Structures are given as C-alpha cells and as structure tokens.
C-alpha cells in the first residue's frame, strides 16, 4: 500500500526488491522486527507481499527466493537497462498452482521454526557485531587486554545461549 512516498508493511510481510540489480541479486526480507501492531514505512523500490490464510510468510518467502520465479520476475522488468523495475501488477498476472491446504499446513509447520531461527541468528549477529565494534577500539588502543576482552565475549556468548 503506498503511503505518501513510501510503502507500508507490518510483521509477517515479505519485502521483495523490484529494481535492478537488487531483484537479480535476490534481495528479499521478512519483516519480523516491528513491535506489536507497529507499522513500518519504506521505499517504493520494494513490493510488499503479505500472507493470507494458509499462504504463510514462509511460503511467500520460499517462492520469492525460488530461482525460476525470480527469473520470471527478471524477464518481466521494464525500463532503461540500468534502472529496470518490476511492476507490482506482475503478481496479479503470474499464475501458480495453489497447494492443497493440507500441504500448506505441513509446509508451515516445518518452516515456521526455521524462520524463527533465521530471526534469532540475525539478532545474534547484530549483537556480536556491536560487541566487536565496542571491543576493537579498546583492544587496538591498549586500554583493554585480550584476556579481558575474552571474558566479556564469553559472558556475551553465555547470555546468547540462555536467550535461544
């Protein structure tokens, strides 16, 4: 949904890059970082794909990452060679067999834990990057010794294990 100069999205939506070279490079993201019913606003250079019924976030994400689907998107792009875009109406024209509800339920049951794990690993990577960014200047300046930093890293990793 366009809002002013941007697009509106919420948790569970999949953001699909519409502009070259981002689409060709596979830029796709699951929105899972907003608080409660918070709504995010962003660039018009991605298309928002929202789950409906048993068509879950993980099913949409898997489709959006599937090479044949991405190739169909790439072929449907228009515009000058350096700034090609995929029109949002591509999705109303693209046909795909809808899986049976039983299969969708089984797929969702198998993939939702993986999506949760992806989010946890992303959060862990961010925390570790912050720790690195805080420790590196201290180590390089000599204000902190390696063994002191090692203790801080061990404590942080112990907290990570407790959180997962």
Regions found by a protein language model. Give the residues of each.
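Short alpha-helix capping/helix-loop boundary micro-motifs
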Residues: 1-5
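His/acidic/aromatic-lined binding-pocket segments of jelly-roll/cupin-type domains
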Residues: 6-7, 118
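A short beta-sheet element
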Residues: 7, 14-65, 69, 77-87
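Conserved aromatic/hydrophobic "specificity hotspots" at molecular recognition or selectivity sites
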Residues: 10-11, 142
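Amphipathic alpha-helical coiled-coil/heptad-repeat segments
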Residues: 54-55, 63, 68-80, 90-164
